[in-house]
């Protein structure tokens, strides 16, 4: 990201031919199609990656993503997961109410809406700028990744608090290419690339799970305090999040179908009545 184009330009760069493909979060394109955000992340929704991955590959999620990208002449090869995010913070945020007035980095889309609903002000910046923004006090907390991902970015050098489990995000990333580039591949190679992308995802999930456990030792050495919200707060945040689902469903016809699909699968899982 940033080596050729900025993260907000990656999507349009496929059309101009600057790039043939990219690996990023669909939510960054929610201004072009709101469904990208609710495909990418479902705050207050799934409890683990397996539930989300099953929605993508067994309940039609990948078809929604491909439909959204087809509008631009692109093909979504597959989804890549990494795990449930936590939130590094420079100040102690011990409850939902403590989010009020805080400056938080959050991506465009439904996650930013959730932060706003909790009373925070949000800033959308690429990951490469988060450390500097934390260090200079531009933001006080950040949405970014799992414990080890945040630690590798150096965030816990300036953040002495970590909100865990994360209440806000367990997103998917996408590997998307231009349809023209995809069509040049023989069918057997296309199949190989799709299968390899699924393998890439689960290799990432298991590696990061191991690294998250190892990062706990490093956080202790850095003097980072792990904070968990009261369970009642997590329940309230889930209620707020689910209200946002309906708000997002009204943004486009595709968004409505995506939300309906999430709800149907969540009911099958017993996550919703």
Pin down the residues of each PLM region:
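N-terminal secretory/targeting leader peptides
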Residues: 1-52, 60-273
């Amino acid at each position: 990201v940033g080596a050729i184009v900025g993260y907000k330009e990656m999507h349009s760069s496929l059309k101009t031919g600057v790039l043939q493909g990219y690996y990023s979060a669909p939510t960054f394109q929610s201004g072009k199609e709101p469904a990208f955000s609710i495909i990418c992340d479902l705050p207050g929704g799934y409890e683990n990656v397996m539930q989300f991955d099953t929605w993508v590959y067994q309940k039609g999620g990948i078809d929604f993503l491909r439909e959204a990208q087809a509008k631009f002449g692109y093909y979504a090869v597959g989804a890549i997961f990494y795990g449930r995010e936590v939130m590094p913070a420079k100040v102690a945020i011990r409850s939902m109410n403590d989010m009020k007035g805080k400056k938080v980095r959050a991506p465009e889309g439904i996650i930013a809406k959730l932060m706003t609903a909790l009373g925070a002000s949000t800033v959308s910046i690429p990951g490469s700028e988060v450390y500097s923004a934390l260090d200079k006090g531009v933001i006080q907390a950040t949405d970014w990744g799992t414990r080890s991902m945040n630690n590798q970015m150096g965030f816990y050098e300036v953040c002495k608090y970590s909100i865990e489990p994360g209440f806000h995000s367990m997103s998917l990333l996408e590997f998307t290419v231009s349809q023209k580039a995809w069509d040049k591949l023989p069918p057997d190679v296309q199949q190989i690339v799709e299968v390899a992308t699924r393998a890439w995802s689960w290799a990432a999930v298991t590696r990061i799970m191991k690294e998250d456990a190892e990062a706990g030792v490093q956080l202790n050495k850095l003097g980072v305090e792990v904070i968990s919200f009261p369970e009642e707060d997590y329940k309230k945040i889930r209620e707020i999040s689910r209200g946002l689902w309906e708000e997002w469903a009204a943004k486009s016809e595709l968004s409505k179908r995506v939300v309906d699909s999430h709800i149907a699968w969540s009911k099958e899982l017993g996550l919703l009545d």
